[in-house]
Amino acid sequence: MASNLTLRIAFAGVAIPLAVGVLWLGGWPFAVVLAALGVLGTREIYDLARRQGIDPLDRTGWIAAAAIPLLAYWAKGSESHWAEPALYFGALWLMVTLVVAMFRRGPAGKPLAAVAVTLFGCLYASALLAFLIPIRHGTNAANQPFAYLCLTLFPLVITWIGDTAAMAVGVQFGGPKLAPVLSPNKTRSGAVGGFLGAVVVAVVLGLLVLNRVGWNFAVWQLIVVGGVVGIVSQVGDIAESLFKREAGVKDSSSLIPGHGGVLDRLDSLYFVVPAAAGLFRLFGVI
């Protein structure tokens, strides 16, 4: 137990500064890191599916997972009308995937399930994280890099502090389970604590940090961001628990010492990042 905790602390001590550094750099280095995380997460989803008798098209999915963040960054910085070509590219990729599944697998190889999991894996593990790109590289990011760095870190920090608050309140007060079948350690009191913690930290960070580096969030907007992040982060956590329960495993992989896999570490962020990007877009921030 002690050695596992030491590994977790050591990994966090290295990973957090690296993550902040990559976010500060932005650009292609940031897109490449997202592509790598997308491929690793996609691979873990495929491994979970394979435990249930579904054999995804690995290479096809990995290529798509790597391409999504790279194309998202290219499109963000391009003045061309990229949306229509992207739709054609997506349709072509789907058709190629289905053709490969049909000819390589045949009816006995469950081609429909293989294609469905192949598509889901890369969209879930890569496309959802790619919403960090429009946050980090918003309209005026070139002139205000520090402001956009803080904006990108904002939902991430809310998530981590909310998760810590949920754990602390759950341990302290206990009570009825939130999702006893999927995540037996989570309690309703912890869920409430995590939600309130997310709202409080969103307001505090928004007023004391974001609004001092160039943003102008109203208190009600910060409450909305904190509330939404406080809810969807817990939903994302439980969703990943569902995947693992279905596959009969404790962790999505053993890639990260003391932490499990990429899915285990980023589970909440798959829901938080697109939700935050949508709210920032709604508020006219990005």
Regions found by a protein language model. Give the residues of each.
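Re-entrant/interfacial helical elements at transmembrane boundaries that shape
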Residues: G170-Q172, L242-A247, Y270, P274-A275
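Membrane-embedded alpha-helical bundles of polytopic integral membrane proteins
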Residues: M1-G227
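Interfacial loop-to-transmembrane junctions
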Residues: R245-S268
